[in-house]
Amino acid sequence: MSNIQNMSLEDIMGERFGRYSKYIIQERALPDIRDGLKPVQRRILYSMNKDGNTFEKGYRKSAKSVGNIMGNFHPHGDFSIYDAMVRMSQDWKNREILVEMHGNNGSMDGDPPAAMRYTEARLSEIAGYLLQDIEKNTVSFAWNFDDTEKEPTVLPAAFPNLLVNGSSGISAGYATDIPPHNLSEVIDAVVYMIDHPKASLEKLMEFLPGPDFPTGGIIQGADEIKKAYETGKGRVVVRSRTEIEELKGGKQQIIVTEIPYEVNKAVLVKKIDDVRVNNKVPGIVEVRDESDRTGLRIAIELKKEADSQTILNYLLKYTDLQVNYNFNMVAIDHFTPRQVGLQKILSSYISHRKDIIIERSKFDKAKAEKRLHIVEGLIRVLSILDEIIALIRSSDNKADAKENLKVSYDFSEEQAEAIVTLQLYRLTNTDIVTLQNEENDLRDLITTLSAIIGDEATMYNVMKRELREVKKKFANPRLSELQAESQIIEIDTASLIAEEETFVSVTRGGYLKRTSPRSFNASSLEEVGKRDDDELIFVKQAKTTEHLLLFTTLGNVIYRPIHELTDLRWKDIGEHLSQTISNFATEEEILYADIVTSFDQGLYVAVTQNGFIKRFDRKELSPWRTYKSKSTKYVKLKDDKDRVVTLSPVIMEDLLLVTKNGYALRFSSQEVPIQGLKSAGVKGINLKNDDSLASAFAVTSNSFFVLTQRGSLKRMAVDDIPQTSRANRGLLVLRELKTKPHRVFLAGGVQSDTSAEQFDLFTDIPEEETNQQMLEVISKTGQTYEIALETLSLSERTSNGSFISDTISDQEVLVARTR
């Protein structure tokens, strides 16, 4: 019971997770700054080398190597080992592959490799240089997981693998992304830094100007590369290598021959084809992956009239033909994860190689001295050969002979052992000369090794020579092109849209669609698809390059490029705004719709039930960032019950406002100030407490009509309402009754001396070939009445007009509209 400890769960969890975090940081996800390898990679290379699975020998089953690695060094499951082995064999992931593999080792399309029982692997030749001299006590070893074998904590690394092949990984609280580089350039930078330990970053970048991805591509942003090499963090643009190829018949196609690092080619081709299918950019006929064993090739065939550069710019901006690569150079340095720059990486590598060369030299020197001691003994034996032979013959056994040699001639234990095991053929004159030559060579070697150990300059010369040998053997041209500046991709949005004729329709309830001229002309206007309780308020022919603005009764404006509207048949109901506009309210209705070619110029006037009015500029309605999902305000309403009564382009000088209680006010539109979208406007008419605005319209004719809720209708002259100033009460256009008083339901101009297009503030529905303006009235009992407004006689200002039906007064008006 004494072994039981009482500890809080918080302490236990914190301490255990700290241990776990330290383990996965140091032993799993991050590379060592010296050899650039993660533990699993190091174990794979060491185990394969230990088993003799090297480049000069035949391939072996991957499963055998994986089993040995898992059983001896890495007990974390065969998949993680095989996955790491496969990655080290993929020439599109590594600048210099460390494992050669026969069979399916995956692809740039993200295809999985074949199972390890089918593939074969061996170390690549350059991987041997990472392990070179490991048998000479050059690196420290540690016990494996079950203390049965020892494994290296770092490899000798005869070339700077961390920079050459890069690394990526995610750990607890740390992540790393180090790009691969060109072997020749890295070695040149190391050699220069050996000669100039305090070399500036600018000077080093003359030798190592930037990453070199195995997939090629174009790297843009010299300043960001410098920042990354200085701080360990930075971001560059990596762009595909493309060219425009001419085809027969004046067509063109975009050819992609190199794609950004770590981009899945199959996913990229699919995304480009999605652009074609969804017609996000017109002009793409077909997307083909024509890659084969000769190299990568993606063909994007274009229509004859297509703008190839605009399409390419769009694809660069909205697909992975161009990506950002983020440097995050984190590596384990003295058992600690650190954000490191180029100078730190190079200096750490040089320091590591210094240790390796010195330890190797000490090992070789000790071995040479041991051999020299033996050779000296053998040469001495040859000068007293007869005595030695006689002594050995007189000895009882090998041990006695060795002891006699040591006592009689002062030979050491090692020399005595070499003498008694010497074969007789070695006593010829030829072997005497050979021993003398070997003695001289050993003395020269020991002198050289002593110089390396004792003289830093000599040691660094050896380091440089060995690096140059690696460069000479494995150097290859740079694959990625470096460009100093990141090019800003500018896309002419208009040029991306195929200009087509279409018909746009909008209902009051918020349904909209575009319809092809063929479908529109094949149906009558009345066959439009809509809900029974909805009303078509807008139909107009337009081009797909134009823009649709929808103004609602709640003071919101909705923007839609016409090419983004759903293309449906005329008889289809259309798409409701609530499907895309998150803030479209249930009680909200479309008040006015307008199609514009541009937002350069144009004014609108808005009038609310509370009698406020304002003008605002169309420029302020230029598409906002969230237009696809949210509307924006064009007028601020005074309260929740307030509504916009009229929204119209400013066409004429005078405006006429008519209130529910029958007051009419006429004033110049120039009195209305131009204000921002968020303002509520200014007072247009001075309302009584129980009054509200019923209608507002521009004065475009000589007369206007007034319809009351009881179904009484009259037509009166505009001149009966003389022009005055804004914010007045106005004149009564109805006579007040004590019982069943009339209240204005709708008022508007009567078309007589102007066109319907100029008059109509509420709809642009194409008129039939008639000069008559009709007022359609629907009673609450469902009765429909149509009145030709021009046939009405002019009435006095104070009259209440005439009922449109003998029974309408008892039913009251439900809906009224002009057409």
Swiss-Prot record:
Site annotation Transition state stabilizer: residues: R117
PROSITE patterns xref list: TOPO_IIA (PS52040)
Subunit structure and binding partners: Heterotetramer composed of ParC and ParE.
Record-listed E.C. numbers: 5.6.2.2
Organism (species): Streptococcus pyogenes serotype M3 (strain SSI-1)
Record has Nucleotide-binding as a keyword: no
Name of the coding gene: parC
Annotated protein name in UniProt: DNA topoisomerase 4 subunit A
Domain Topo IIA-type catalytic, chain residue ranges per copy: 30-496
Site, as annotated: Interaction with DNA: K38, H74, H76, R87, K93
Protein topology in the membrane: Peripheral membrane protein
Keyword Chloroplast: no
Matching HAMAP family: ParC_type2 (MF_00937)
SUPFAM superfamilies: GyrA/ParC C-terminal domain-like, Type II DNA topoisomerase
GO annotation, cellular component aspect: chromosome; cytoplasm; DNA topoisomerase type II (double strand cut, ATP-hydrolyzing) complex; extrinsic component of plasma membrane
